[in-house]
């Protein structure tokens, strides 16, 4: 089997981490928002209250497409390039010039660095990949918890079961 250069593995892990960090920003914003929307919707249905316009619309990790929270302008794919787009846009929405939180590039950078450290420590192995997945979950949960004091079951339960399965596989193999 061909051995990969450590520097290349670390660089690829850094790039992957930046991309995953960009996705984690979506998770950090949308998972708690989706929970709140579902709770309100369920409460209104239980109380037989009328729904306001747009309340029943689909909202999840993928829908609606990314947009500026201030002016609701759609974000183009090039505006989602981790860190680089933040620098090119000077930390502002292209349309309304509202400030973009510094947390977005920080989450991307943190995730990229953590992935790079995992690759440096474990190399191109399944252990590195599982450490990256575990780290991505933890980063998302840290920021969600900091914002809302919630740890959503959508994140904690897969992490728990994944940890159990990974440990059993390592133990049995």
Positions of PLM-derived features:
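A membrane-topology feature that recognizes alpha-helical transmembrane segments
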Residues: 1-173
